[in-house]
Amino acid sequence: MKPLFTGTGTALITPFKNGEIDWDALDNLVESQIAGGVSALIAAGTTGEPSTMTWDEHIEVIRFVAERAKDRACVIAGTGSNCTREVIHAANVVKDFGVAAQLVVTPYYNKSTQEGLVAHYTEIAEKTSLPIVVYNVPSRTVSYTHLRAHET
């Protein structure tokens, strides 16, 4: 099986200035990463602090990064949420921006069972067309998707 991604990827921060997204700083960040040889950019992953943004801002960050990186680096869009329907909605919106995949963090705070996590990711896979990068970060989410769960 051929890998979806090769090379180096950077999880981007989302710069803010006076409580608003600093689009010029984000543009400079994207350009500097691409100039440095990065082949993938992760937009609105946990490093980008999407939990501190509105969904409109979250989606706009992904759109902005995808537009700036077009044909120069692939973009992996952070679509994760506790709400499966929100993940599906976000993925179906950002696919039109030309992103390569979606980064989906395990649902946090609610502490799902493995069966619940499998149901979450299965529904996302069934209702979206973007490849899913399962993002396990148990120190933040208090849950972990075991590899065996993905065999189902």
Report each predicted region and the residues it spans:
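Conserved small/polar residues in nucleotide/adenosyl-binding loops
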Residues: 145-152
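Hydrophobic pocket-lining residues within nucleotide cofactor-binding pockets
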Residues: 15-16, 149
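N-terminal amphipathic/basic leader segments beginning at the initiator methionine
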Residues: 2-13
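Active-site beta->alpha loop and helix N-cap motifs at the rims of alpha/beta catalytic domains
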Residues: 3, 17, 23-142
